[in-house]
Amino acid sequence: MKKFSKIFFYLTAVVLLSWLLPWLLQFAASKPGNDPFTLYSCVTKRFAYIQSSKDNGVKRYDANGTEYTVAQFDSILPTFYYRQLFSKDRLPDTINGKEVTPKIIAHGNFTFKQSARDVNVTKPALNMIMESMPDRIDLENPIEAFRTTDRITFIDMRDNTVNEKKSALFDKVMKQKGFEFPMRTLSGNPTNRKEYDEGYLMVDNNHRVFHVKQTKGLPYVRETGVAPELGIEHVAITEFSNRKTLGLLTDKDNNLYVLNRDYTLHKLPIDKYDPKTNTLTIMGDIFYWTLKISDERGVTTYAVDADSYAFADSLRYDYPETALDKWSKYIFPFELSFTSYDDQWVKPRVSMGSCWVLILNFVLAALFYSM
C-alpha cells in the first residue's frame, strides 16, 4: 500500500509539474510579438507596412525598404487613409483610372477575419433566420429559428412552437432543388446590424453548395453550381457593403475560393489555408484585397486584384524565435495544457519535447531512486 501511495504521489507530481512549470516559464519569459500592420498599395504596387520598436519608435516602409513620412504613407494608401486625405484636400479625383470619392471608397472597403477558434466550435442545433425583404427599410430581428435533420424544421421563438406550414414548404422546395439531407455545414449572420441579408450558405450531404434565405416569408433556394468534386468543407457568408461577393469557401485540399453574388466561383491564388489551424484576415478596397494567413510560425500576406482576383504580390513575415521557444523543448520532455488558441474547448493536451530529454529524465530518476 505504501509503494502504491508513492507511485500515485509521483504520478500526480509529474502531471501537475508538466502543466505548471511550462505555464510559469511561458508567463515569466514570453514577450508579445506582433507582425507589422501591412497593406498593399494601389499607388506604388508594393506592400507598405508600419514597424514599431522601443528603440526606433514607429517607422513606415514599403517592401523595397523605402521609408516614408506620415503624410507620404497616407498618400500611398489612399483607400485606407481617405478620410485624412479628404480633410486635408489631398484625396485625388482618380486613382489608376478609377474615379474616387470618400463615398465610393467607403462602399468598397471591407474587413473580414476568421480564426481557428471561430471554426473549431460545437455548432448550435438551432439557427435563427431573418426576413431578407422586410416591409420597412431596416432589417428586423429574427423571430424564427430552424434546425436540420433529415428535413428542415422552423420554430417560432416567441412561443417555442413548430411552424409546420413553413417547415413543409421550405423542405419541399429544398428537396426539389436537389438538397440532400443531412446538411454538412452552413454559414449565416442573422443580425439586423448590417445593410442587407443574404440568409445562409449551406453545404448538403453531397458537398453541393446552396444559397437559402427567406423572402416575404417564402423560401429562396438556389444551387450555386459549385462542383461537388471540390469537396467544400467550410463556408463563410460575407455580406460586404459592395454586394459583390456572397461568401468564402474552402475545399478538402484547403484551397480558398470566393463566391460572387452571381454564383461564379474564383479560386484565390494563394497557398493553402486551413481554417482549423490558421487565421485569415482580409482587408479589401476597390483595387486590391490584402489577405493575411497566420500560423504558429508567422504570417504570409498576399495581394490580389479586387476585380479579377489575379495574384499581385506576396510577403512572408516570420515571428522572431525567442530563447524560450528554442530551449523549452529541451527542458521539458513533455508538456500538459488544457486550452489552445485554436479552439474554445478545455481538455487535456500533451505535446512532446525532445526524446533525449525524456531519456535523460528517466536516467536521473533511476539514479535518484537507487540512492
Segments and roles (model prediction):
Residues 6-26:
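Hydrophobic membrane-insertion alpha-helices, especially the h-region
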Residues 2-11, 348-371:
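Juxtamembrane interface at the cytosolic side of transmembrane helices
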Residues 310-359:
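Short, aromatic-rich amphipathic segments at membrane interfaces
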Residues 215, 220-310:
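Membrane-proximal low-complexity regions enriched in glycine and acidic/polar residues
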Residues 97-173:
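A cross-kingdom signal targeting lumenal/periplasmic-facing segments of multi-pass membrane
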Residues 43-71:
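Short extracytoplasmic
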Residues 36-40, 75-96, 101, 123-142, ...:
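Repeated scaffold domains used in trafficking and secretory/extracellular systems
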Residues 22-52:
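Alpha-helical transmembrane signal-anchor/signal-peptide segments
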